[in-house]
Regions:
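Short, surface-exposed connector motifs at secondary-structure boundaries
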Residues: 13-15, 92-97, 149
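Hydrophobic, well-ordered secondary-structure elements that form the walls
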Residues: 31, 42, 72, 80, ...
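A donor-sugar binding/catalytic signature common to diverse glycosyltransferases
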Residues: 66-113
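C-terminal amphipathic helix plus adjacent low-complexity
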Residues: 130-175
């Protein structure tokens, strides 16, 4: 974890925002503008996207070229993610409730699965607004049930040894 993140003030909720390599300009712009002036500290590994699209990050958004998602997700109070398998699994393994903005049908399905478990909110990529994003974040910050469910899902995921199970499957299937 970059020292800059560890040194951030702890007086505001920390939001981890990662929209993946499939993020588009419209979604990035809406997410970016949503955080401007919001009462959060935001960390994001989307520096290249912002530079490519010539977008300016608000003062409360700290951009990085790359972040170890498995290390920074547990530090976050809420994540804002695109809903790919990796981002959803990392949020779940970290016990972090999230707002998902699926950019593809598979991502929307991933988000919906966790939303049904009570610790995620899905927003539509074409029509979400700043107000909806901030309300969703605020809802997850205040919702004790969502935080509890996120921790329960984290416990379930920790009970499985994915590496061991994958190795066992490969050996049993392919010798």
């Amino acid at each position: 974890v970059p020292q800059e993140i560890l040194n951030l003030p702890k007086d505001k909720p920390l939001i981890y925002c990662a929209m993946g390599s499939s993020a588009n300009r419209a979604v990035l712009r809406t997410v970016l503008e949503s955080f401007d002036g919001a009462p959060y500290t935001v960390i994001s590994p989307m520096k290249a996207h912002f530079e490519k699209e010539k977008l300016r990050a608000p003062s409360n958004v700290h951009l990085f070229d790359w972040l170890p998602a498995d290390k920074v997700n547990p530090l976050a109070d809420v994540a804002v993610i695109h809903g790919g398998q990796g981002t959803v699994q990392t949020a779940c393994a970290s016990g972090t409730p999230f707002v998902g903005i699926g950019l593809q049908p598979e991502q929307e399905a991933n988000i919906d699965m966790i939303a049904r478990q009570g610790c995620a909110i899905r927003l539509g990529k074409r029509n979400f607004t700043r107000q909806q994003l901030l309300q969703s974040i605020e809802s997850l910050l205040k919702d004790e049930h969502a935080r509890k469910r996120a921790k329960e899902i984290q416990s379930l995921s920790q009970a499985w040894d994915g590496t061991k199970n994958a190795a066992k499957f490969l050996i049993e299937t392919f010798g």
